[in-house]
Amino acid sequence: RGLAVLEGIEADLQPDGWRLGAGEGADLRRARSLLAQDLDTAEELGGTFFRALKIQVAGPLTLAAMVERPRGDKMLADHGARREIAESLAEGLRTHIADVRRRFSGANIVVQVDEPSIVAVMTGGIPTASGFGRHRSVQPPEADALLRMITSSITDAGARPVMHSCAPDLPVELLAGAGFAAISFDLGLAKPADVWAETFEQGVDLWVGVVPSLDARVSDAEIASMIETFFSQLGFDGDAYADRLVVTPTCGMAGASPGWARTALSLAQTVAARR
């Protein structure tokens, strides 16, 4: 999905993953076609009924860690390539958001930028092509610059940028400073700390990932209690976060059964409504 949005960069799916190429490969054409079909279906079924609509893409750091250069190894290995993919994503998002806004003119658009690899990228945890080494870590100033390209393009297009990652030890201060309006995270991996409280006080919303992504026995009361405990440890009572609370699954739901996906979304709605 992230590659389907890129502007001016073509790629093809190889046996070992996506690789940049001279032209648009069949798999990238298919990805772009599926994206258009998804929007067509949503427009047909939802039309003007959406008050808010969330779209999502892989972020620049994660893309750089996943996509290979034409001659091999990840784009992460090259400073210029990292910047190129961020610029391409920023430009592509402007076009993508404009298309979504044309289809859903009355909706408030939220763009979720998925960065599951951000911690590994910034701590030197991404293996090289040989598997015997690790790519150098991307330092905070560069990570900030790359993410700012994305948040600026989203904001300029009239949408709301939200960062999502299920990784532990997120660089919360960096994300807040990069222009994200909200941070979506796995509550089970977040340690209550001053940085979360400071971020929330600065106006960055916290999207609390607390509903299990896979089938589980849990009640809305138990989920609500976990949220209340977290915010209480940060020094906030219910009134402080009631109007800013967004309840989400802990991480992606690709592995969930259809039945649990429905249950999880229902639980999230019920818990959010309790406030």
Predicted regions and their residues:
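Catalytic-face loop-and-helix region of soluble metabolic enzyme cores
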Residues: 181-274
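Alpha-helical structural signal in soluble globular domains
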Residues: 45, 103, 149, 153-157, ...
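Hydrophobic faces of well-ordered beta-strands that scaffold small-molecule active sites
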Residues: 51-59, 109-114, 161-165, 181-185, ...
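Glycine-rich anion/phosphate-binding loops
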Residues: 27-43, 83-96, 221-229
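Active-site loop segments of alpha/beta catalytic cores
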Residues: 88, 92-192
